[in-house]
Amino acid sequence: MIKKIQTSLIALVVSVFGFFSVPLSTASAADCSVHIGDFDWDSANIHTAIGAYILENGYGCDVQVTKGSTNPILAALIDNQIDIIFEHWTDNNVQLIDPELESGNLVFLGVNTPASEQAFFVDRATSEKHNITSVEDLAKPEIAMLFKDPENPEKGRLTSCISGWTCYTINLVKLKEYGLDDLYTNFDPGSGGALDAAIKAASTKNQPIVTYYWTPTSLMGKPEIDLIRLTEPAYDESCWNDMMTVVEDIKANGPEVYKPSCACEYKDMALTKLATGKFAKEQPAIIDFANAYTIPTAVVNNMLAYYV
């Protein structure tokens, strides 16, 4: 993905520089070595590719990129094995990241994309035919069977996040709290590409699908993909924090430690950037650039539609 983007990125970078005003450094690669953490979804790949290109060609840095799922990349960042990440879904990892920010081990670098959403979606045709507009509407056996899981045909399938993403465990807890875990599996598609492929296949074959998804993405900008966001209990900070305590416990100790809590919708949020405190002290010019780096959501969607 990064190589594909960088082959035609020069003109894009010229236009992107209109969004920030930090002068390029003349530091040599010997003075600037950057290890960027990247993730296994498209918008993060875009930001990583742009950041890496600018750091290599504008700042003369020696850039290394390590790609992986949320949990191992954030663990590597906390352990100072990675220097910086250019996309972070803040509210999905509050319990993990906030203590690191408070201690100074990590530093917050501002917003990269001002608006995003993540939620449960149903294809429009199924939503309109069966009047499915909320998670409550999923709580009927006959509705669950519309989304039958071929690997567990007694249940419906919620096409969920990848198990290495925090949202996989969030969705697991949500299914339990909404009383849906006896009716639906929390299906791990295996990769972000496989998640996209499942949604595309359902659309092409006119098959029902209930799925977790998010924006910004290239898929949501395609005219043939028509998904309806399901309503959930409104976002509540106290409820969310209680739920995330359970989520982090499950991530650390396994699903058997689940304790009833509460659940609510994902918070629509700005996506952010993080670096280690050590790197911030050593490379203030790079931190100035990273703080200034931000691209409007509509531009990110257009880039994703073009490149992906």
Model regions: which residues?
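Short, well-ordered beta-strand elements
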Residues: 30-43, 61-66, 155-159, 290
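Short helix-initiation/N-cap motifs at beta->coil->alpha
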Residues: 39-42, 62-76, 186-197
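Short, polar/charged alpha-helical segment
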Residues: 42-61, 173-175
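Pocket-flanking alpha-helical
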Residues: 48, 66-104, 217-224
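Ligand-binding pocket segment of bilobal, Venus flytrap-like solute-binding proteins
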Residues: 76, 82-87, 159-243
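A conserved helix-loop-strand patch within extracytoplasmic ligand-binding domains
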Residues: 105-160
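A bilobed periplasmic-binding-protein/Venus flytrap-type ligand-binding module shared by bacterial periplasmic
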Residues: 118-128, 270-282, 305-306
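C-terminal lobe and pocket-closing loops
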Residues: 223-294
